[in-house]
C-alpha cells in the first residue's frame, strides 16, 4: 500500500460510521482526529428499552437486512470482540388477504429469491423474475404499487395507485416500508429493485446464510465500541468531544476551514481530508450545497419486555393494518407500526398497547409458530407486558424518488470532502449494512486521496 502519511484526516461525527472509519484509517497510518458534538464511539442502539424518545438512536431495530454479512465481517477483524455480537436472524414474510389462506414466505435465502420461488411452475417464476428485474430499471417516477387493503391515510381510495391486491404486490409494499421506513406509495420502484436485485444472480442463487442479522447492543456498547476506541487511540488517533460543527469555509474546489462551536477554527492544509458522518439535518446545515433533503424518515415503534429470552433472533414482516414488522431478540420484541397508524396522544395509550400486543400474539402464532403470551410476565391490569412507545426520526432521510436518483450522481462540493453514512451507498437500503458499505467505500476513496 502507498504511504498514507501525507495529510491529516478530520472525521466529523463519532457514531458507528465515523468511529469505524476513523479506527480503520488510524490503523492504516493516517493522522486522524475524530470530532463529535457529544462523546464519540457511541452507537444508535441502546442497552435497554427505557431511553429518551427525542433521540433518533432509540428507533433502530436490532434485526436488520444484511445479505452480504458486512456488519459481521467488519467486527470479525477484531479478535477481542465476541463473535456472538452479530448473529443470523430468521426472517418471515406473512401475508393475509381476505378469506384466502395465509401466505408464509421464508426470506432467509434472499428477498428476490423467496418471492420468485413462492410461485408455482417455471413459467410463473420466470414472469415474476422478469417483473422484479424490470423494477430495477424503472423510471424514478414509478412508485411501488399500493394494493387495495393496504391503504394509507393520505391516499384517496379511488386513486389509480390503489391496485387490486395480490400476495406479490402486498409483499413488495411491505418490504418497501420495512426497508426504507417510509410509506410504500412514496417509494420508487427503481429504489426497491436496486436493493432487492443488486445483481442478476440474486434471482438465480440463494444465500447460504440468512439475509437478516441481529446485533446485541450490550456487547456492542460495552465491548465492541470500547475496543474500537482503544485501537483508535493506540494507533495515534485523537478525539475532540463536545465539538459541534458550525460551518465549513471553502474555495471553489477545497474545504479550507472547519468551524466548531463559537470560537474554534481548524485550518485545513491542501492535502488534508474531511469526512462528514452526520445525521441528515446536521449534514445539510454544514453543507447546504449538497442538495440533499434534510427531512429524515420516521419510525413509529413499540417495545415489549419479555420474561424469557428468545433462543434465536427472528423477525416477521406482515401486511397487517396495524403492525408492519415484529423483531424478536434477547428479552424483548420491537414492533414497527404500519405507516398509516398514529400513536395516541390522549389517555388511551394502555388500550392501544393492549391492542397491539394482542395483534402481535396472533401474528406470531400464525406465522412464526411462537407463543408470545408464555414469555410475558410483567403484565399490567390489562394483560399487556411492560411497554414503551417510540416516535422518532430514523438516522437517514426519506428516500423519495428524486432523492433516490440523486444518490447515483451525488458529488461532494469539494475535492477533499467525503460523505459517510446510511444514505450514500446507492444499492443498499438505509441501515447498518449501508453504514459499513459506506465505510468500505470511503476508506478506499481516502486511500486513493492520500496516495496521490
Residue ranges and their predicted role:
Residues 48-74:
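N-terminal glycine-rich dinucleotide-binding loop that anchors FAD/FMN and/or NAD(P) in oxidoreductases
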Residues 27-50:
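Glycine-rich FAD pyrophosphate-binding loop
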Residues 28, 243-363, 409:
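Mid-domain catalytic core of redox enzymes
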Amino acid at each position: 500500500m502507498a504511504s498514507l502519511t501525507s495529510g491529516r484526516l478530520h472525521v466529523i461525527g463519532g457514531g458507528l460510521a465515523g468511529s469505524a472509519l476513523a479506527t480503520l484509517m488510524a490503523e492504516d497510518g493516517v493522522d486522524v482526529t475524530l470530532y463529535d458534538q457529544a462523546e464519540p464511539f457511541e452507537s444508535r442502539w441502546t442497552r435497554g428499552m427505557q431511553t429518551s424518545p427525542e433521540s433518533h438512536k432509540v428507533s433502530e431495530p436490532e434485526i436488520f437486512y444484511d445479505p452480504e454479512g458486512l456488519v459481521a465481517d467488519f467486527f470479525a477483524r477484531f479478535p477481542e470482540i465476541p463473535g456472538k455480537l452479530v448473529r443470523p436472524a430468521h426472517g418471515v414474510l406473512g401475508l393475509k388477504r381476505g378469506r384466502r389462506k395465509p401466505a408464509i414466505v421464508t426470506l432467509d435465502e434472499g428477498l428476490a429469491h423467496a418471492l420468485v420461488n413462492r410461485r408455482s411452475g417455471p413459467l410463473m417464476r420466470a414472469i415474476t423474475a422478469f417483473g422484479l428485474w424490470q423494477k430495477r430499471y424503472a423510471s424514478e417516477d414509478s412508485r411501488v404499487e399500493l394494493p387495495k387493503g393496504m391503504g394509507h391515510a393520505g391516499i384517496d381510495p379511488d386513486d389509480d395507485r390503489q391496485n387490486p391486491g395480490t400476495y406479490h404486490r402486498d409483499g413488495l409494499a411491505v418490504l418497501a416500508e420495512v426497508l426504507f421506513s417510509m410509506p410504500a406509495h412514496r417509494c420508487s420502484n427503481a429504489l426497491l429493485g436496486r436493493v432487492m436485485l443488486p445483481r442478476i444472480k440474486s434471482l438465480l442463487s440463494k444465500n447460504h446464510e440468512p439475509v437478516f442479522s441481529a446485533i446485541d447492543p450490550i456487547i456492542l456498547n460495552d465491548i465492541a465500541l470500547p475496543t474500537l476506541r482503544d485501537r483508535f487511540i493506540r494507533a495515534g488517533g485523537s478525539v475532540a468531544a463536545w465539538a459541534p460543527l458550525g460551518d465549513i469555509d471553502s474555495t471553489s474546489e477545497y474545504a479550507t476551514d472547519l468551524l466548531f462551536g463559537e470560537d474554534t477554527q481548524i485550518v485545513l492544509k491542501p492535502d488534508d481530508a474531511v469526512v462528514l458522518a452526520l445525521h441528515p439535518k446536521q449534514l445539510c446545515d454544514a453543507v447546504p450545497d449538497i442538495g440533499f433533503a434534510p427531512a429524515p424518515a420516521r419510525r413509529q415503534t413499540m417495545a415489549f419486555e419479555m420474561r424469557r429470552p428468545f433462543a434465536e433472533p427472528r423477525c416477521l414482516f406482515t401486511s397487517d393494518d396495524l403492525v408492519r414488522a415484529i423483531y424478536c431478540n434477547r428479552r424483548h420484541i420491537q414492533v414497527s407500526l404500519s405507516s398509516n397508524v398514529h400513536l395516541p396522544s390522549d389517555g388511551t395509550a394502555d388500550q392501544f398497547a393492549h391492542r397491539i400486543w394482542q395483534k402481535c400474539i396472533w401474528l406470531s402464532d400464525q406465522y412464526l409458530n411462537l407463543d408470545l403470551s408464555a414469555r410475558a410476565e410483567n403484565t399490567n391490569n390489562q394483560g399487556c407486558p411492560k411497554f414503551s412507545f417510540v416516535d422518532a426520526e430514523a438516522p437517514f432521510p426519506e428516500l423519495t424518488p428524486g432523492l433516490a436518483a440523486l444518490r447515483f450522481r451525488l458529488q461532494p462540493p469539494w475535492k477533499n470532502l467525503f460523505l459517510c453514512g446510511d444514505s450514500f451507498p446507492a444499492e443498499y437500503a438505509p441501515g447498518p449494512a449501508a453504514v459499513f458499505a459506506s465505510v468500505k467505500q470511503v476508506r478506499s476513496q481516502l486511500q486513493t486521496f492520500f496516495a496521490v
